[in-house]
Amino acid sequence: MRQILIAVAVAVTVSILLTPVLIRLFTKQGFGHQIREDGPPSHHTKRGTPSMGGVAILAGIWAGYLGAHLAGLAFDGEGIGASGLLVLGLATALGGVGFIDDLIKIRRSRNLGLNKTAKTVGQITSAVLFGVLVLQFRNAAGLTPGSADLSYVREIATVTLAPVLFVLFCVVIVSAWSNAVNFTDGLDGLAAGTMAMVTAAYVLITFWQYRNACVTAPGLGCYNVRDPLDLALIAAATAGACIGFLWWNAAPAKIFMGDTGSLALGGVIAGLSVTSRTEILAVVLGALFVAEITSVVLQILTFRTTGRRMFRMAPFHHHFELVGWAETTVIIRFWLLTAITCGLGVALFYGEWLAAVGA
């Protein structure tokens, strides 16, 4: 628990102190955000706001994670695990793709960065490497960071994927979550606040897995998860980094996370869901992200098949703006919905454990 608190504290500190430095630097360099011409009129005043704030988020996550492990050396904490490094590696790789995308947008002074093909190739490459590596690094108990079994709150032994299918499954998960968070990042503080709650829920889940790991506490309801405490530190550091960034990103935002941050954060969810064996449960925890990307898919499908749009604008947070909701109203209500779905997700997780132990 001490390591988790340290991870949060370090991540918040680094993120909240580094972000204003980036604001001044990016403002001086003219690294301003470009606004969609077809977006809500109220957003045009945001043109020129510094972007690429995801750099501070990634720095906070890395600092929180490494700081917690360094502190752990003083009180016999667990060392760095393969699971945590793989999740961080995935997030950093996707953040790199987003950074290039943001840089192109800034250099060309338009809201279009990497073309779809290049961006997709970057996401797929990151996902394939993750999918291959996550089935390696078997520990003394025979556990790998990931499992080829589909999982809800633990592995579903009756649904096992062949290695190639598992890698393809990882491509779908990584692409879906990174794009989902990217679509959600359209209002001041929406993605950062939502992500803080989702990863806070993951802190509870992975810490519970750590306390009830089959390796150290065998028995009914135990979890076969490699490095659960390591995953809790990743989740805690991510929550802390998002909170620190939110201090500057809350409406009216002084800086945006850009694709650097949104793609990286999507990678964190994807990585945590695979390594903690909660791929299906993650859909409940991150229901808002799922709803946002679903609204985009439905908008495209309905327009191509009927010539009409289901929403006034997608992602659907813009739809609510265009029907008269204030931006802050949309943000707060979406945060409330996320708090509910995260609470539901944790309740489902705990309920499954109670059922497993026969309580």
UniProtKB/Swiss-Prot annotation:
Membrane topology: Multi-pass membrane protein
Transmembrane segments: 3-23, 55-75, 80-100, 117-137, 156-176, 187-207, 231-251, 255-275, 280-300, 334-354
Xref: Pfam families: Glycos_transf_4 (PF00953), MraY_sig1 (PF10555)
Pathway: Cell wall biogenesis; peptidoglycan biosynthesis
InterPro entries: Glycosyl_transferase_4 (IPR000715), PNAcMuramoyl-5peptid_Trfase (IPR003524), PNAcMuramoyl-5peptid_Trfase_CS (IPR018480)
GO molecular function annotations of the record: metal ion binding; phospho-N-acetylmuramoyl-pentapeptide-transferase activity; phosphotransferase activity, for other substituted phosphate groups; UDP-N-acetylmuramoyl-L-alanyl-D-glutamyl-meso-2,6-diaminopimelyl-D-alanyl-D-alanine:undecaprenyl-phosphate transferase activity
One of the GO BP terms on file: cell division
Presence of the UniProt keyword Membrane in the record: yes
Principal location: membrane
Cofactor requirement: Mg(2+)
Entry's EC annotation: 2.7.8.13
Protein origin, superkingdom: Bacteria
GO cellular component, one term: plasma membrane
PROSITE patterns: MRAY_1, MRAY_2
Location within or outside the cell: Cell membrane
Catalytic activity: UDP-N-acetyl-alpha-D-muramoyl-L-alanyl-gamma-D-glutamyl-meso-2,6-diaminopimeloyl-D-alanyl-D-alanine + di-trans,octa-cis-undecaprenyl phosphate = di-trans,octa-cis-undecaprenyl diphospho-N-acetyl-alpha-D-muramoyl-L-alanyl-D-glutamyl-meso-2,6-diaminopimeloyl-D-alanyl-D-alanine + UMP
Enzyme class: transferase
UniProt keyword list: Cell cycle, Cell division, Cell membrane, Cell shape, Cell wall biogenesis/degradation, Magnesium, Membrane, Metal-binding, Peptidoglycan synthesis, Transferase, Transmembrane, Transmembrane helix
HAMAP family from the UniProt entry: MraY
Note: Was identified as a high-confidence drug target.
Protein family (similarity comment): Belongs to the glycosyltransferase 4 family. MraY subfamily.
Physiological role: Catalyzes the initial step of the lipid cycle reactions in the biosynthesis of the cell wall peptidoglycan: transfers peptidoglycan precursor phospho-MurNAc-pentapeptide from UDP-MurNAc-pentapeptide onto the lipid carrier undecaprenyl phosphate, yielding undecaprenyl-pyrophosphoryl-MurNAc-pentapeptide, known as lipid I.
NCBIfam families tied to this protein: mraY
Name listed for the protein in its UniProt record: Phospho-N-acetylmuramoyl-pentapeptide-transferase
Gene name of this polypeptide: mraY
